[in-house]
């Protein structure tokens, strides 16, 4: 079976001919040197050109990143080496390195060295710490030296490829080569070392259209993959995947298996000749340079081959080497969230295939390794081979002794105790299979679930899943697609009933087999169930869990991580990254158990679990209860005063809210509680809350609405004392305390307003106020001050002033005449009264008003809200006079029925 290798193009950068490419080790950058003399830096994540260096007018055949110095080093046909700072774009250094075209640059991984090769047949070593002095010259080739590469397993050794048809291996410090490899019939263009520890191999490509694999210890050619139709211009071992990548002037890039040397894939992007290739350890990205530009492709899946059993034993594959680590061995080591765990790694041996996935069975006794179209089942303890076979895919059942394989796109086989139990062909083929309580088979038509026992169709769903995750109980299942995930409930009782009665069974299976609980628009990368809580990592690098329709974020991850498992006794969740680093995050099992019990409405169990939840986690649980609609329980559980106060308000719990407000001493809380108290008609509590909140406006509203005169009086004094002058003024005004209103305006410097108030209500004070106003205004504008007229000096400008004095006296003497509220219907409204007329009939001897014989209150000046009077009745003579002067047209007849004959007359 072929190697399963996903290939995705990430970047296409059109440009002039590309002579070399390089990838930055930490930034998402690709460096491309061009035949036109420019060097470009592309961001392959944003697909944008981020930097350009105009090097010279001649081809730049070599360019490399020196990340630890923030440099780009270039070599061109003008024989110059140039060093640029890629942050500032400044040229740091420039020197002539060779007497002919510079073909290649190699950067030493640890020392301050670069190696350069040239058409002058020389290789030179340069030390940038010694002002770029030439430390050594390597002579021996008799033609152009096309490429040099440093041995990743021995940094003092490097190899060179030349058009003299040879490959030479050199040692730093020695000017002559260690040995020479010969075998190509034409010039050798490219060379690379195998970075794995298991094989001492070199690869070379030449103008004879051949690729050769060399054992540099035995100095022999071990393989010659054939297939290119033109000169082979580049060749490399991928540092992570078991593949060889070669590029040719025939326009194709060929991918070969590095163990079997089988051709796995051929890429042709139609960009003419291929000139260069670059890959990077720790990344699946590969950069390719063509005549018409450059391309970055992503090969394979970045998810590591890694698995953890329920006891904390982790197995992973590093290339073909299988290693193990045990979380128990950490003992009582303090673990911090998100920090790499200091695990002791144990080598378990080598795997016969290149592992692409590793997965424990449910009880952890066995582990399956899949790759190269094959699977091998090992014992988890000693890595002993238990079973093997060919398969495109493998899936464990919930029963640890049972599993399924997808033999082809049409055949699925089920095994029990390592023996084939059943083979069947799904109706619409099998593109992928999924394990768990039911066997899931994806086809072009959707997803079908089958019974493991008899392969009977349970339900067909029109959905294209990427992953399927079953809970331990088998009641819940998560189906993750490209854009979202669904939470379904498996109704096993209804399935059993339908299988017995054959009711509700259609061609798509049992209709009531599943109940959809929710759909969430988020992409699941990896996931697992703990009880009824689904924990997952998302496409935006968040670690979340879903329970009861609520998504809780556990952590924001700084890189892509993959879930390994959850250890309840540790209360920790474990994840790994593609570099095989293990990290952990705290997640209390008691919290998950409580939430699971609530979701199942098992409140007796929830009450038993609650005491085991630490206090610092209670508020998280309370938020969950609130979202589930159990606010009363949330109020009991929560330990956060803010949250409890909000819940108390929502539930109308005045006592609890009052206690929390006293503890918090927050004006905002007192205002919120006052609103609730008013809505509950608890006016005394509302008054206290408003006092605590110093909400004078609210107190005024409450006092006036309830008709509490003493409260208005106290409020006026308190508001004035605290500088709340508007409220104080209104409180005095509502009580009819005009003198206090006037003095308040004067004290606060509101003299114009005081003058108008005096003119309207207290004419006896107007002269004093105008004098004060004039004195104050003269400090700013003398002319304006002189233009102010005192009403007592210019009575002609203020008509009715004398009458106003009389009214004022009348008001003062009758102001104390207040009437009971029950007489309100008998009182004439202020807008219908004529105070001047009432004051004319006023006699000082009647200052103390008496009840009139008809029971109506005597006349009194109702200028303020606290003053009342009755409607004034006209005398008989006044009515006679009114009738004499009335015209017929003045009579309103809208509500009177008149005889039409009379109207006609």
Curated annotation (Swiss-Prot):
Primary location recorded for the protein, binned into one broad class: cytoplasm
Q: Where is this region: Disordered?
A: 837-905
SMART domains cross-referenced by the UniProt entry: WD40 (SM00320)
Cited CDD domains: Coatomer_WDAD_beta-like, WD40
Q: Coiled-coil intervals in this record?
A: 867-891
Task: Describe where the WD repeats fall, as residue ranges on this chain.
Answer: 13-52, 55-94, 97-136, 140-180, 183-224, 227-266, 350-388, 390-425, 746-783
GO CC annotations on file = COPI vesicle coat; cytosol; Golgi apparatus; Golgi membrane
The membrane topology of this protein is: Peripheral membrane protein
**Compositionally biased residues, Acidic residues:** 878-905
Q: Which residues carry this modification: N6-acetyllysine?
A: 627
Example of a GO biological process term = intra-Golgi vesicle-mediated transport
Q: Which domain of life is it from?
A: Eukaryota
Where does this polypeptide localize?
Cytoplasm, Cytosol; Golgi apparatus membrane; Cytoplasmic vesicle, COPI-coated vesicle membrane
Positions carrying Phosphoserine are 859
Which Pfam families does this chain map to? B-prop_COPA_B_2nd, TPR_COPA_B, WD40
Complexes and interactors = Oligomeric complex that consists of at least the alpha, beta, beta', gamma, delta, epsilon and zeta subunits. Probably interacts with PEX11A. Interacts with JAGN1. Interacts with SCYL1.
Q: Which PANTHER family match?
A: COATOMER, COATOMER SUBUNIT BETA
Job description of the protein: The coatomer is a cytosolic protein complex that binds to dilysine motifs and reversibly associates with Golgi non-clathrin-coated vesicles, which further mediate biosynthetic protein transport from the ER, via the Golgi up to the trans Golgi network. Coatomer complex is required for budding from Golgi membranes, and is essential for the retrograde Golgi-to-ER transport of dilysine-tagged proteins. This coatomer complex protein, essential for Golgi budding and vesicular trafficking, is a selective binding protein (RACK) for protein kinase C, epsilon type. It binds to Golgi membranes in a GTP-dependent manner.
Q: Which family does it belong to?
A: Belongs to the WD repeat COPB2 family.
What is this protein called in UniProt?
Answer: Coatomer subunit beta'
- Which species is the source of this protein? Rattus norvegicus (Rat)
Gene name linked to the record: Copb2
């Amino acid at each position: 079976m072929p190697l399963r290798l996903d290939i995705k193009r990430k970047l296409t950068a059109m440009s002039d001919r590309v002579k070399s490419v390089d990838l930055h080790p930490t930034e998402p950058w690709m460096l491309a040197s061009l035949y036109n003399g420019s060097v470009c830096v592309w961001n392959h994540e944003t697909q944008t050109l981020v930097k350009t260096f105009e090097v010279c007018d001649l081809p730049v055949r070599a360019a490399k990143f020196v990340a630890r110095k923030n440099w780009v080093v270039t070599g061109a046909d003008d024989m110059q080496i140039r060093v640029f700072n890629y942050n500032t774009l400044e040229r740091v250094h420039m020197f002539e390195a060779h007497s002919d075209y510079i073909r290649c640059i190699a950067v030493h991984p640890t020392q301050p060295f670069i190696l350069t090769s040239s058409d002058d047949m020389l290789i030179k070593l340069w030390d940038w710490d010694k002002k770029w002095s030439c430390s050594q010259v390597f002579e021996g080739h008799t033609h152009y030296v096309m490429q040099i590469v440093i041995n990743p397993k021995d940094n003092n050794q490097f190899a060179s490829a030349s058009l003299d048809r040879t490959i030479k291996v050199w040692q730093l410090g020695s000017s002559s080569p260690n040995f020479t490899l010969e075998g190509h019939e034409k010039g050798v263009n490219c060379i690379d070392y195998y970075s794995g520890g298991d094989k001492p191999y070199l690869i070379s490509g030449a103008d004879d259209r051949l690729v050769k694999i060399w054992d540099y210890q035995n100095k022999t050619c071990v393989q010659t993959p054939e297939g290119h139709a033109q000169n082979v211009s580049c060749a490399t071992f991928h540092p992570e995947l078991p593949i060889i990548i070669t590029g040719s002037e025939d326009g194709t890039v060929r991918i070969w298996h590095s163990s079997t040397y089988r051709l796995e894939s051929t890429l042709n992007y139609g960009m003419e000749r291929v000139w260069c290739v670059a890959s990077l350890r720790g990344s699946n990205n590969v950069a390719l340079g063509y005549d018409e530009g450059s391309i970055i492709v992503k090969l394979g899946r970045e998810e590591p081959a890694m698995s953890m059993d329920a006891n904390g034993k982790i197995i992973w594959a590093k290339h073909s080497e299988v290693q193990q680590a045990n979380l128990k061995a950490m003992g009582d080591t303090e673990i911090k969230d998100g920090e790499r765990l200091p695990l002791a790694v144990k080598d378990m041996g080598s795997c016969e295939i290149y592992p692409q996935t590793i997965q424990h069975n449910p009880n952890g006794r066995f582990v399956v390794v899949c790759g190269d179209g094959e699977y091998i089942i090992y014992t988890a303890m000693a890595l002993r081979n238990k079973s093997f076979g060919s398969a495109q895919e493998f899936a464990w059942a919930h029963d640890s002794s049972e599993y399924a394989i997808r033999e082809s796109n049409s055949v699925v086989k089920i095994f029990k105790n390592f023996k084939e139990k059943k083979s069947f062909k799904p109706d619409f083929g099998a593109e992928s299979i999924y394990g768990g309580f039911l066997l899931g088979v994806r086809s072009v038509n959707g997803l079908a679930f089958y019974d493991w026992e008899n392969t009977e169709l349970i339900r067909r769903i029109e959905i294209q899943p990427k992953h399927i995750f079953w809970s331990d109980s088998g009641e819940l299942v998560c189906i993750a697609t490209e854009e979202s995930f669904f939470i379904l409930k498996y109704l096993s009782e209804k399935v059993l009933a339908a299988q017995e009665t054959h009711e509700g069974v259609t061609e798509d299976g049992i209709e009531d087999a599943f109940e959809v609980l929710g759909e969430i628009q988020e992409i699941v990368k990896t996931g697992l169930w703990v009880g009824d809580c689904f924990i997952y990592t998302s496409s935006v690098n968040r670690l979340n869990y879903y329970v009861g329709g609520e998504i809780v974020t556990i952590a924001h991850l700084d890189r892509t991580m993959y879930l390994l498992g959850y250890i309840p006794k540790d209360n920790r969740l474990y994840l790994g990254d593609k570099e095989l680093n293990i990290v952990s995050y705290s997640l209390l099992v008691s919290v998950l158990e409580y939430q699971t019990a609530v979701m199942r409405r098992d409140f007796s169990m929830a009450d038993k679990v609650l005491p085991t939840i630490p206090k610092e986690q209670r508020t998280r649980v309370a938020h969950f209860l609130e979202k589930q609609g159990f606010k009363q329980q949330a109020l009991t559980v929560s330990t956060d005063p803010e949250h409890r106060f909000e819940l108390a308000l929502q539930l109308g719990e005045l006592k609890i809210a009052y206690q929390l407000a006293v503890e918090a001493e927050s004006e905002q809380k007192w205002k919120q509680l006052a609103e609730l108290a008013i809505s509950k008609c608890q006016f005394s509590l509302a008054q206290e809350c408003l006092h605590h909140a110093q909400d004078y406006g609210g107190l005024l509203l409450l006092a006036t609405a309830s008709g509490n005169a003493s409260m208005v009086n106290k409020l006026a004094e308190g508001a004035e004392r605290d500088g709340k002058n508007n409220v104080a003024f209104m409180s005095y005004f509502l009580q009819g305390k005009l003198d206090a209103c006037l003095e308040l305006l004067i004290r606060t410097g509101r003299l114009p307003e005081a003058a108008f108030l005096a003119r309207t209500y207290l004419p006896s004070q107007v002269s004093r106020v105008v004098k004060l106003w004039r004195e104050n205004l003269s400090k700013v504008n003398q002319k304006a001050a002189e233009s102010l007229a005192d009403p007592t000096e210019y009575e002609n400008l203020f008509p009715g002033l004398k009458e106003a004095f009389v009214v004022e006296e009348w008001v003062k003497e009758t102001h104390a005449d207040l009437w009971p509220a029950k007489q309100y219907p008998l009182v004439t409204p202020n807008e219908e009264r004529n105070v001047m007329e009432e004051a004319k009939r006023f006699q000082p001897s009647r200052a103390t008003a008496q009840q009139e014989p008809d029971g109506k209150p005597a006349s009194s000046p109702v200028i303020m809200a606290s003053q009342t009077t009755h409607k004034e009745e006209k005398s008989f003579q006044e009515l006679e006079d009114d009738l004499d002067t009335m015209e017929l047209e003045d009579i309103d007849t809208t509500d009177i029925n008149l005889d039409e004959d009379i109207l006609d007359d």
